[in-house]
Structure formats: C-alpha cells, structure tokens
Amino acid sequence: MPKMKSNKGASKRFKKTAGGIKFKHATKRHILTKRTTKNKRQLRPNSLLAKCEVAAVLRMLPYA
C-alpha cells in the first residue's frame, strides 16, 4: 500500500504537541498600523486548536 500524502497547507500551519495541535494566528504579517494594540497583543501567543477541529486536521496530517 502506498504512503498517504499529507496536506501541505496543513503541514505548514499546524504542529502536533502533547497538549494538542498548535497554530499561529493570522493577520500578523504586515500592515499592522490599522490594528489596535489590544488586537495585536491578543493575536500574539500561539494557540491550541479547538477540540471540534482536531479530527479534521489530523485527517490532513496522517503521520502527525
């Protein structure tokens, strides 16, 4: 049986850890002058994926 392919977009965005699946928030690259300080601060930490979305991401990453 051939190897399963990982979804390349998902493999670049998500990382499996012992506590769950880690991801980085979007809209933090450029043109940040429009955003408030509070908004930028809230987007700062890496977050864990919600439980309802974990199964879908793990299907995209068969070897995670």
Curated annotation (Swiss-Prot):
Top-level lineage group: Bacteria
Gene Ontology CC: one annotated term: cytosolic large ribosomal subunit
Pfam family, one: Ribosomal_L35p
GO molecular function, one term: structural constituent of ribosome
Keywords of this entry: Ribonucleoprotein, Ribosomal protein
Transmembrane feature ranges: none
Record-linked InterPro entries: Ribosomal_bL35, Ribosomal_bL35-like, Ribosomal_bL35_CS, Ribosomal_bL35_sf
Biological processes annotated in GO: translation
Disordered: annotated span: 1-22
Ranges of biased composition (kind: Basic residues): 10-22
Protein's UniProt keywords contain Ribonucleoprotein: yes
Protein family per UniProt: Belongs to the bacterial ribosomal protein bL35 family.
PANTHER family: 54S RIBOSOMAL PROTEIN BL35M, LARGE RIBOSOMAL SUBUNIT PROTEIN BL35M
Protein name listed in UniProt: Large ribosomal subunit protein bL35
Organism (species): Aliivibrio salmonicida (strain LFI1238)
Gene: rpmI
